[in-house]
């Protein structure tokens, strides 16, 4: 495999590719609850373009409630194709709720959302987005390699084998590909889940707390994979407590109690104030 990204075969959706350890590329409130303050605007209030491709992610009054308790206030959000976003906030701030609705795992209480112009939960939206959950889930009887093959073939990836080899080598799991990931430690499970998220093609990647449990090698591999995927044009949204990684993003969105409290340039953000009391991830 060539180390030049320009020589890599291009597909309609991004493929995270590596080269054997050295990658070549790879709201407002509603319902029974009292009204809330107006949603923060920031860049999400920018006028929509009348022409051109649809945004990678768009939400209109998207909200989630559990009974009368809001998990996410109605949210209007627009993320353009190719943006790299860091999503921060305390546990319970709404980050995971938002991501799960976007990938079709959680039914919104109200509002709408699209992925690459397609309604969330549709076949097209599911094909466009790769999701790494905060708690990876594996099949009990499949090895790491069998998981990779299943996911790659499910998404029509013909040349998945070399790609899979490169990914497992990069995260340091080459000697564990024939083992069941359900038996792994938290850190090894996270590494296995990373390979599975990147082995398939995608336009949009949503990752929830990916640094949890990773050692130095794993964190370096993750950052490199994200950089390469972004370089290939993928839209990335990374929910994280790893504040040192925020500087790699072009846009920062902070949530607190289900509302946006900041949306803008990470360099202009007061991270200490936005994340007061949040414990950063540790190995």
Positions of the model-derived regions?
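Conserved ABC ATPase "signature" region
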Residues: 149, 153-176
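H-loop/switch region of ABC-family ATPase nucleotide-binding domains
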Residues: 239-241
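Conserved ABC transporter NBD signature motif
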Residues: 111-125
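Catalytic Walker B motif of ABC-type/P-loop ATPase nucleotide-binding domains
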Residues: 205-209
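The feature captures the beta-strand-to-loop junction immediately N-terminal to the Walker
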Residues: 88-90
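Helix-to-loop junction immediately C-terminal to a conserved catalytic motif
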Residues: 103
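Helix N-cap at the start of a conserved alpha-helix in ABC-type nucleotide-binding domains
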Residues: 216-218
